[in-house]
UniProtKB/Swiss-Prot annotation:
Protein family: Belongs to the class-II aminoacyl-tRNA synthetase family.
Reaction equations catalysed: tRNA(Gly) + glycine + ATP = glycyl-tRNA(Gly) + AMP + diphosphate
UniProt GO MF annotations: arginine-tRNA ligase activity; ATP binding; glycine-tRNA ligase activity
PANTHER family reported in the protein's UniProt record: GLYCINE--TRNA LIGASE, CHLOROPLASTIC_MITOCHONDRIAL 2 (PTHR30075:SF2), GLYCYL-TRNA SYNTHETASE (PTHR30075)
GO cellular-component term (any): cytosol
Taxonomic path: Bacteria, Pseudomonadati, Pseudomonadota, Gammaproteobacteria, Enterobacterales
Encoding gene, per UniProt annotation: glyS
Name of this chain's protein: Glycine--tRNA ligase beta subunit
């Protein structure tokens, strides 16, 4: 069977840049699934994406499905015919579904009986006939949150469609996709090359588009070119470009023919905090800032034009004129804000609502101030500095700079606090209070910042859970999952002596009578332990290891982490599997017993050597391990407990627990309970698989 290259290109108006990659990747994944479901043999499915097009190129696509043999078993002969030999309704319905009459059916005889059988040779459908529906289905499944309609058509897509190219080899596949009749016409760059041309063969793509249309259709190629050219441009002026991945992706999605250029701005603007300048360049203008080797911002930026100009200086000057007013605004806001102290913004926080049932930002500030001081006391941080940081924590939200450039919240608080002469750890805390903002983000760097960051997040968790608005499904408007994981990361990775129970209780107490959920403390702790589960799964821990620790519900995050590491290490020991099984057996025995057990094992009642030996070792280990448990040395404790494997195995081999003698039975059950209690001081290892 011969093979050909298939090309589909959907020519559109400008597609959403932040969604371009996901649209193209989904298009490729959907179409690959369609090919596989149809049984069409194919080679590589390559996707292309540019601002005004999505395309797929499939190598070595078979021209038809393979022929296949099908068999459909019908009713058993006993049910297929009545006593007179006439076909039953069931048989006739089955035959009708197969497109035959009952007398045309074959018979299948097996050891279990005889059935009607339809057997047919089905010729594979041509690829040409299948492709239009496969393309339409793949496009319909794209992750488009908001569709649009254009003109008088009822067709909906992410953006208006102007061309549809469907080529199998050199042949146009006739179809109407998204309201457009397929053709071999492709549109080029808006301002360079040929605005429209025809493509003779699918194999010519994407080279013909580059040569005639001045469009680099390969997304990764455009991105790599921008990165390389920007790095070279920065090197020429003695700096390093800030090529953040997200901005690089967005810029690659905005241009069809990237041309990297370098521009500059007045050095006087460098007196403004670099974060505000960078926010303006990256967020508003999609420029790449340039830093000197010492990390200081240079008065230059790199941008990407979508055209090759005969006079690039004109484009450079135009971009410099565009960015200057924005930088001047930042300079003005910075100078204006510094005319008063950060603390002077406190009264204005009373005018901004945090949440209707939970009060204003000033109310939140008061709670954070108190909670940050309480946390500081628990972890040995400077209480006065922590409460001061809490008081100032939201003041920068009322400044002109943050109002205009919202992403500078926190960092501008730090700059204004330094200007006001606040303590350095207070200023840094204002910047780091929102950390970690995302997975893998840096944690607060000093104890005061840790106290403030935890206080801010715990106040939100307690408040939102306290009014019953916990996250549901994928909806999490207050980012509670991120807040919970942030608190856990700070406590664990900074090894802070904090207990979620008392921490949550204190956060809830500070709300007074505002909260309506009577179970708020337990709800918050359960939610945070659930985030622990997700975190440790991401870290590669097995589900049963996590469940074994969660079963003990340890509420000290650092303690939880120590238990996780201990159980993970325990699983590597030779005795682990046997002791996990033994614990499961003990757990089942105790669960089935309704006896009232003793407080201690009665040594005089013990009879068998195996139970005497086990009882003695349990007593010895109980005393030996007490300081281990007190110090959180769970790994050492489990290593010691692993020594119980032989006496435990011997006990179950030689000793009957559920004997008729009640006193002896209760004594043996008590010993097993004491044995299990030792392991439960760390985790429920009976849950290990």
């Amino acid at each position: 069977m011969s093979e050909k290259t298939f090309l589909v290109e959907i020519g559109t108006e400008e597609l959403p840049p932040k969604a371009l990659r996901s649209l193209a990747e989904s298009f490729a994944a959907n179409f690959t699934a369609e090919l596989d479901n149809a049984g069409l043999a194919h080679g590589t499915v390559q996707w292309f994406a540019a601002p005004r097009r999505l395309a797929l190129k499939v190598a070595n696509l078979a021209e038809a499905q393979p022929d296949r043999e099908i068999e459909k078993r019908g009713p058993a002969i006993a049910q297929a015919f009545d006593a007179e030999g006439k076909p039953s309704k069931a048989a006739e319905g089955w035959a009708r579904g197969c497109g035959i009459t009952v007398d045309q059916a074959e018979r299948l005889t097996t050891d279990k009986g005889e059935w009607l059988l339809y057997r047919a040779h089905v010729k594979g459908e041509s690829t040409e006939a299948l492709l239009p529906n496969m393309v339409a289905t793949s496009l319909a499944k794209l992750p488009i949150p908001k569709l649009m309609r254009w003109g008088a058509s009822d067709v909906h897509f992410v953006r208006p469609v102007h061309t549809v190219t469907l080529l199998l080899g050199d042949k146009v596949i006739p179809a109407t996709i998204l309201g457009i009749q397929s053709d071999r016409v492709i549109r080029g760059h808006r301002f360079m090359g040929e605005s429209e041309f025809t493509i003779d063969n699918a194999d010519q793509y994407p080279e013909i588009l580059r040569e005639r249309g001045k469009v680099i259709a390969d997304y990764e190629e455009r991105k790599a070119k921008i990165k390389a050219d920007a790095e070279e441009a920065a090197r020429k002026i003695g700096g390093n470009a800030d090529l953040s991945e997200s901005l690089l992706e967005e810029v690659a999605s905005l241009v069809e023919w990237p041309v990297v250029l370098t521009a500059k701005f007045e050095e006087k603007f460098l007196a403004v905090p670099s974060e505000a300048l960078v926010y303006t360049m990256k967020g508003d203008q999609k420029y790449f800032p340039v830093y000197a080797n010492d990390g200081k911002l240079l008065p230059n930026f790199i941008f990407v034009a979508n055209i090759e100009s005969k006079d690039p200086q004109q484009i450079i000057s135009g971009n410099e004129k565009v960015v200057r007013p924005r930088l001047a605004d930042a300079e003005f806001f910075f100078n204006t804000d510094r005319k008063k102290r950060l603390e002077d913004n406190l009264p204005r926080l009373q005018t901004v609502l945090f949440q209707q049932q939970l009060g204003t930002l000033r109310d939140k500030t008061d709670r954070i101030q108190a909670l940050a001081g309480w946390i500081a006391e628990q972890i040995g941080a400077d209480v006065n500095h922590a409460t001061r940081a809490g008081l100032l924590s939201k003041c920068d939200l009322m400044t002109n700079m943050v109002f205009e450039f919202t992403d500078t919240q926190g960092v501008m608080g730090m700059h204004y606090a330094r200007h006001d002469g606040e303590a350095e750890d207070v200023a840094v805390a204002l910047n780091e209070q929102y950390q970690p903002r995302f997975a893998g983000d840096d944690l607060p760097s000093n104890p005061v910042a840790c106290a403030l960051a935890i206080a801010d997040k715990m106040d939100t968790l307690a408040g939102i859970f306290g009014i019953g608005q916990h996250p549901k499904g994928d909806k999490d408007p207050f980012a509670l999952r991120r807040a919970a994981l942030g608190v856990l990361r700070i406590i664990v990775e900074k090894n802070l002596n904090l207990d979620l129970q008392t921490l949550t209780e204190e956060a809830v107490r500070l709300y007074g009578d505002k909260l309506t959920n009577a179970n708020v403390v337990d709800d918050v702790i359960d939610f945070m332990l659930g985030r622990f589960r997700a975190w440790y799964q991401d870290e590669g821990y097995t589900v049963d290891t996590i469940q074994a620790v969660l079963a003990r519900r340890p509420t000290r995050p650092a303690d939880f982490d120590a238990r996780m590491k201990a159980v993970s290490h325990f699983r590597t020991l030779d005795a682990a599997a046997a002791l996990a099984a033994a614990n499961k057996r003990v757990s089942n025995i105790l669960a089935k017993s309704d006896e009232v057990l003793s407080d201690r094992v009665n040594a005089s009642t013990l009879k068998e050597p195996e139970e005497i030996k086990l009882a003695m070792q349990v007593v010895v280990l109980r005393d030996k391990l007490e300081p281990y448990f007190a110090e959180g040395r769970y790994q050492d404790a489990l290593v010691e407990l692993a020594e119980l494997r032989e006496p435990v195995d011997a006990f179950f081999d030689k000793v009957m627990v559920m004997v008729d003698d009640k006193e002896l039975r209760i004594n043996r059950l008590t010993m097993l309970e004491k044995l299990r209690e030792l392991f439960l001081r760390v985790a429920d290892i009976s849950l290990l698989q």
